Amino acid sequence: MSVADIRNSAESRMSKSLDTLKVNLSKIRTGRAHAGILDHVQVEYYGSPVPVGQVANLNLVDARTISVQPYEKHMAGPIERAIRDSDLGLNPVSLGDTIRVPMPALTEERRRDLTKVVRSEGEDAKVAVRNLRREANEALKKLVKDKIISEDDERRGQDEVQKLTDRAVADIDKMVTQKEAEIMTV
């Protein structure tokens, strides 16, 4: 394993941590509607749980309402139940074969709670990135110990890994700040 291999491995794993954070932040509800909020809601379809997006067409009616159009009419009831029973705090309204999902306005207290959750997600991502940095630095030290690379190469490798870490942490901070601003916007 070379310095470049260690650097590339650290970079790809850090990028996966950022992707995970992005997914986790997208699940946190703001006051605005977006179809992605229903991505992890599962509905029973012929005996097996499937995401709502696979059994219905999801559209945004306006900034605060999602329209759910089931592909099969008999699925309207189960979809409505699945959305209501999810942990999102949504109250769908059935209009015949279409379901409207209005996004309730967030209270100030709920907004503060959500910003704490966002900060916590960001901190978890930073810890993951720092752990990856530590693993990369340990791998570099092992290469020096095994006399595969020189100490100068190790130092250069550590500098590169540190730059990757700094960039990842800056990206995490930016994502967290954007999400907090989105939540606090009334």
Curated annotation (Swiss-Prot):
One of its GO terms (biological process) is cytoplasmic translational termination. Its main location: cytoplasm. The keyword Transferase does not apply. GO terms for cellular component: cytosol. GO terms for molecular function: ribosomal large subunit binding. The keyword Cytoplasm applies. It is found in: Cytoplasm. InterPro entries: Ribosome_recyc_fac, Ribosome_recyc_fac_dom, RRF_sf. Keywords: Cytoplasm, Protein biosynthesis. NCBIfam families: frr (TIGR00496). Belongs to the RRF family. Responsible for the release of ribosomes from messenger RNA at the termination of protein biosynthesis. May increase the efficiency of translation by recycling ribosomes from one round of translation to another. This is Ribosome-recycling factor. It comes from Bordetella avium (strain 197N). The gene is frr.
